[in-house]
Each structure stands twice: as structure tokens, then as C-alpha cells.
Amino acid sequence: MKQMNYIINEENELRFFSIIESLLFASGEPLGLKDISEIIELNTLDTKEILQKMIREYEIEKRGIKLIEIEKKYQLVTKEENSCFIEQLLKTNSSQSLSQAALETLSIVAYKQPVTRVDVDEIRGVKSDRALQTLLQKSLIKETGRLDVPGRPILYSTTEEFLKHFGLESIKELPSLEELLEEFQEEDL
């Protein structure tokens, strides 16, 4: 698609806000800057500027949604303070929550990624096949390749869904293991 060089003024900026908001809403998934830019036929620099303004506007306004950036992609999400109402709507039940084994497995994948099933099993001390399958089904982890050793075991890493689920923009926002250890030690006191 051909990109146009619009002069961004208040009128067409509002029009781009509207178009981008519609795209993000209809998509339901994060959209990359380049994709948005191509669809609205605007250069990436101006598109990024509009997206940043949109993020600020959503923060200021008393709305139920906000625009977030996750690993250089943009998505409309509900505000955290409304999560209890969303849960009621979706009637979240305990069968949808993660088991202790799945949480342990997810933690290992998050901190050691990319990681093989054997690595996870060794750290947990038990088999993790079922937990890995659950996490794959819930799209919290994904297969990201194979290790170049005999048997070529599958490598697992976390997904964008993992980041969204835990309110992170990047895996770098995870607390360090040292911080977690410190926190647990303080709780024990």
C-alpha cells in the first residue's frame, strides 16, 4: 500500500485516532506499528506519534479501556481496576485457573526461556508434560524451536498472551529471582 504524507492537524489526527481505535478493537490482537501504518497509509513516524498520543489520552480519560504497547505492538485492553467486573461477566471458575504444577512450570519457562521439557522436569523434580500441555492450550507458552542436540527436544518460551495475562509490556519487567527471594524471606520474618 502506498503511504501518504498527510499534514497532521487536529481534524485528521482525530480521524486517525478513530481509525486506529477501530482497527485495534476489531483485531482483538496486538497490531504492529508497521501494519497499522500501512493500513492507514501514513508513515511510521507519524503513526507512532499518534499512537503515543492515544496512549496518553486513554490514561487521562475516565474510560474502561486503555491502549498499551507490548513488544512494539499495540492493543486495546480493559483497565485493571475493572477486572473484577470482567471476571463476573466471564464467570471465571476454578477450572480455568492454573494448577500449582502449571504455575511452577510457567515460572520456570518465564525465567529460563527458551527451555526444554527435560530442563523443566529437572528443576521441578517431576514430569511436566501435562502442565506444559495446559500452558500451550492456554497460549501462555509456545514452541519456539528445537535444541541442536540428539533427539532435538522442543524449546518453550512465553507468549504475548503471558505478558497480557500478567500485565507486563516485556519479559524484562519480571522481578529478578533475587528480588523474589528477598520478598519471600521478608514474608517469613
Swiss-Prot record:
The keyword Cell cycle applies. Keywords: Cell cycle, Cell division, Chromosome partition, Cytoplasm. InterPro entries: ScpB_csome_segregation, WH-like_DNA-bd_sf, WH_DNA-bd_sf. Homodimer. Homodimerization may be required to stabilize the binding of ScpA to the Smc head domains. Component of a cohesin-like complex composed of ScpA, ScpB and the Smc homodimer, in which ScpA and ScpB bind to the head domain of Smc. The presence of the three proteins is required for the association of the complex with DNA. Its main location: cytoplasm. One of its GO terms (biological process) is chromosome separation. It comes from Clostridium tetani (strain Massachusetts / E88). The keyword Cell cycle applies. This is Segregation and condensation protein B. It is found in: Cytoplasm. Participates in chromosomal partition during cell division. May act via the formation of a condensin-like complex containing Smc and ScpA that pull DNA away from mid-cell into both cell halves. Belongs to the ScpB family. Transmembrane segments: none annotated. GO terms for cellular component: cytoplasm. It comes from the Bacteria. Coiled coil: none annotated. PANTHER family: SEGREGATION AND CONDENSATION PROTEIN B. Disulfide bonds: none annotated.
